[in-house]
C-alpha cells in the first residue's frame, strides 16, 4: 500500500500493489486510487478471500476521522477476478453505520437502552456505568473497525449514551457478498 503524504500524518492518492519482486511469477498488479485519503495513523491492509471464490481479495481500512475517543474508518474491498486476466476490481461495501441503521433499532426508556437486532433484544441500564446525562436516542459510530476473520469480513462500532462518547457496548456486523456488494 503506497500513498503520497498530504500534511502532518495525512496521506492521499493511494496505490495498491500486489505481487512483484524477485519471486514474482505473474508480475505485479497495481491499482491507483487518487480519491482515497487517510487522516491519521496507519491504515490497515488485509489479503484474504472474503467472498469464497478461492481468490484472495485486498481489504483496505482507511482512517477517515480520528481524535480523542474517535476513530472512524472507510472500507475498500478489491475483489480479485480472472476474466481471463488476473485483476482487482473495487466493489461497494455498506458502511458500518449504514448497516447498523438498517439492522438495529436503538431506543431509550428511562435508564434503559434497548437494542433490537432481528428478533433478539438486548437491554442495558446505562446508570451502572456511572453516566448521568444520556443522549436521546443513543448514538453509534465514534469508534469503528473493519477486519476479515476466517474468510468473513466483520465491521464493529460502539454504542454510546453521552457526549463525549460514553461507551455501553459494541455492535459487530458480519458482512456477506451478494454478488454486487458487501452488506
Label for each model-derived stretch:
Residues 4, 83-85, 93-183:
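Acidic, small-residue rich beta-repeat scaffolds with periodic aromatic anchors
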Residues 3-6, 14-21, 70-92, 174-183:
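Beta-propeller blade repeat segments, especially FG-GAP/WD-type strand-to-loop junctions
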Residues 64-68, 160-163:
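Short glycine/acidic-enriched loop and turn motifs that connect beta-strands
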Residues 41-50, 142-149:
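Beta-propeller blade termini
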Residues 50-62, 149-157:
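Acidic/hydrophobic-patterned starts of short beta strands in beta-sheet-rich repeat architectures
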Residues 1-42:
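Terminal domain-start segments
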Residues 61-64, 116:
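Beta-strand C-termini and the immediately following turn/loop, strongest in propeller blades
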Residues 42-43, 59, 71-74, 139-142, ...:
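Short, surface-exposed coil-to-beta transition loops
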